[in-house]
């Protein structure tokens, strides 16, 4: 449970513009005897105000009665810098307590009465939620932008920490952080083994808080779409996905039971479960049925076919990096034998657990019948599994083919006149739900490589006369490799930027640098020498990479570094110059054309 809170703090380092939800971290006395007695103050409503002992008795948060304000479900506490009249405080410390409490009460009502997120029971029924206005105190450490959850020392009361600017009218941060409070209060103060506290649930906390905020403000945001849509192949529970992978929730809500499909996961979870295991259990599904359901969701990702599409598509069209992320809808495949229609997914882009690949196809003719022989490279240790099917699109409207989960199977799909866009969608659907933590990244996650032969269509990029799409979003195609380069960036002609790689922002890239796969350089980063950036890696603004450094997998780097191989996001590793992390995925061979013969 507390590991979830610590994780949020770690991930704050690398959020792209998203306000992270870090549960309040408190100083812990060594023994219970050192803790002052908890004090329950008088309340203005039925719920009590509870001030945690480490805030009150040892002065960690030196609150004062004349710097508080209460409503039915919340108590606001602020620091000395805002004084007793914060509406007239200096600008940096100025806020309106009445407005913040009004926002919070409306959010509370929405989550409780409209979403029916959780019953008003346990600690939620006993105590008002503590809301600390940060950056207004004289003591150090109270400087969070926005954080939510509960006070972790005694686990009695929900808590939000938020800066004045983050709590302005219409605050997304308040909606997101109160979402975290509700999540934790689904199980705090209740007996039994309930609660999404397994490490594999870590990403789902942020996924859910973002989704909850979207219900309040449907046109106000849609999460970190750039990271998610650039890394759709990574595991569903990847930390790279935690603000953007809410679309699976939306699919389940749309098709399988409304909002209750989402809230039941939180209210009926067991503390040993991955959220998808909870969903499987409470809906009485087999693992195969769960896998098919998630594969159908992946098919919907081709056109983002959801009931709230009109609200979030503007964010997809204008997201950070839209010029290169939206240039291609899907991933490339490599030709094993183009003449026989034999292709393979690059190993680095093979889907992990409930990640997926969208492979755009060019039909041989209008109304073509497409035949496919799919074969996965199975690993007993991984419990390998795949689910795959076709999607045809005409005038923006999708039509879905049946999903197959055969590891060595043949399927066909009859296109209709006018269906010029066709996709093969392959989802990693293992035989069991693995419990990856959010920071158990690329080298610790199983990937599920595969090959296929196809007739009646050709993967886009391999057809005769192929032409790249026009470069959009203020960028151009780099002459050496064909990747997308921001017009503001400085990229030498000697630098290789692969067909699907990108250099974004005002970055400077020189020397013999290679940027490959779906990797990208971001912000004002500098990359030089013989550096290789590959797979799903990101070089963030502030980085200055040189020498023979290799950055791959799902790694991100934002610091100066000149040596080492980094294949997994690890905020504690820094620049140590060492070799790459050991990958649990083993090498495999290549199937013959005969093994992939299309026989029906």
Q: Which residues does each predicted region cover?
A:
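Beta/coil-rich, acidic/histidine-enriched accessory regions frequently appended to metallopeptidases
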Residues: 30, 272-470
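Surface-exposed patches in mature extracellular/periplasmic domains of secreted proteins
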Residues: 112-129, 189-202, 222-228, 260-268, ...
């Amino acid at each position: 449970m507390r590991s979830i809170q610590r994780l949020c703090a770690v991930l704050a380092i690398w959020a792209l513009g998203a306000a992270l939800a870090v549960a309040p971290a408190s100083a812990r006395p060594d023994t219970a005897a050192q803790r002052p007695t908890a004090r329950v103050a008088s309340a203005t409503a039925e719920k009590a105000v509870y001030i945690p002992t480490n805030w009150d008795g040892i002065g960690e948060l030196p609150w004062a009665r004349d710097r508080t304000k209460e409503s039915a479900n919340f108590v606001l506490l602020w620091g000395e810098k805002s004084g007793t009249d914060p509406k007239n405080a200096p600008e940096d410390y100025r806020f309106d307590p009445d407005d913040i409490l009004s926002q919070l009460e409306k959010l509370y009502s929405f989550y409780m009465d409209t979403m029916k997120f959780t019953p008003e029971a346990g600690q939620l029924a006993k105590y008002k939620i503590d809301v600390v206005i940060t950056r207004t105190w004289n003591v150090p450490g109270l400087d969070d932008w926005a954080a939510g959850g509960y006070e972790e020392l005694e686990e009695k009361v929900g808590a939000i920490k938020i800066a004045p600017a983050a709590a302005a009218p219409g605050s997304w941060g308040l909606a997101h952080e109160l979402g975290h409070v509700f999540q934790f209060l689904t199980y705090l103060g209740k007996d039994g083994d309930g609660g999404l506290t397994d490490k594999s649930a870590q990403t789902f906390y942020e996924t859910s808080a973002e989704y909850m905020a979207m219900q309040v403000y449907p046109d106000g945001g849609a999460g970190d779409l750039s990271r998610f849509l650039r890394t759709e192949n990574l595991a569903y529970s990847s930390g790279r996905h935690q603000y953007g992978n809410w679309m699976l929730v939306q699919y389940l809500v749309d098709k399988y039971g409304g909002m209750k499909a989402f809230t039941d996961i939180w209210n009926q979870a067991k503390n040993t479960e991955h959220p998808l295991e909870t969903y499987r259990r409470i809906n009485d599904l087999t693992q195969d049925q769960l896998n098919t359901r998630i594969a159908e969701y992946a098919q919907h990702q081709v056109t983002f076919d959801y009931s709230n599409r009109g609200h979030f598509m503007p964010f997809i069209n204008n997201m950070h990096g839209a010029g290169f992320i939206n240039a291609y809808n899907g991933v490339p495949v490599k030709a094993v034998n183009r003449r026989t229609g034999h292709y393979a997914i690059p190993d680095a882009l093979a889907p992990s657990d409930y990640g997926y690949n969208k492979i755009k196809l060019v039909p041989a003719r209008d109304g073509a019948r497409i035949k496919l022989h799919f074969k996965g490279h199975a690993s007993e240790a991984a419990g390998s599994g795949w689910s795959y099917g076709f999607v045809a699109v005409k005038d923006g409207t999708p039509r879905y083919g049946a999903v197959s989960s055969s590891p060595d199977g043949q399927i066909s799909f009859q296109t209709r006149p006018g269906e010029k866009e066709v996709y093969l969608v392959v989802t990693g659907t293992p035989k069991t739900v693995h419990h990856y933590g959010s920071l158990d990244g690329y080298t610790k996650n199983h990937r599920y490589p595969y090959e296929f032969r196809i007739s009646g269509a050709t993967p886009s990029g391999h057809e005769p006369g192929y032409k790249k799409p026009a470069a959009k979003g203020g960028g151009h195609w780099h002459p050496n490799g064909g990747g997308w380069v921001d017009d503001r960036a400085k990229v030498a002609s000697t630098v290789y930027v692969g067909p699907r790689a990108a250099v974004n922002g005002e970055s400077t890239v020189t020397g013999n640098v290679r940027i490959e796969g779906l990797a990208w350089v971001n912000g004002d980063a500098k990359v030089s020498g013989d550096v290789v950036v590959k797979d799903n890696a990101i070089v963030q603004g502030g980085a200055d990479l040189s020498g023979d450094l290799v950055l791959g997998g799902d790694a991100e780097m934002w610091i100066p570094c000149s040596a080492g191989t980094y294949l997994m996001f690890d905020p504690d590793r820094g620049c140590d110059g060492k070799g790459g992390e050991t990958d649990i995925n083993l090498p495999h061979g290549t199937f013959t054309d005969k093994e992939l013969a299309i026989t029906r």
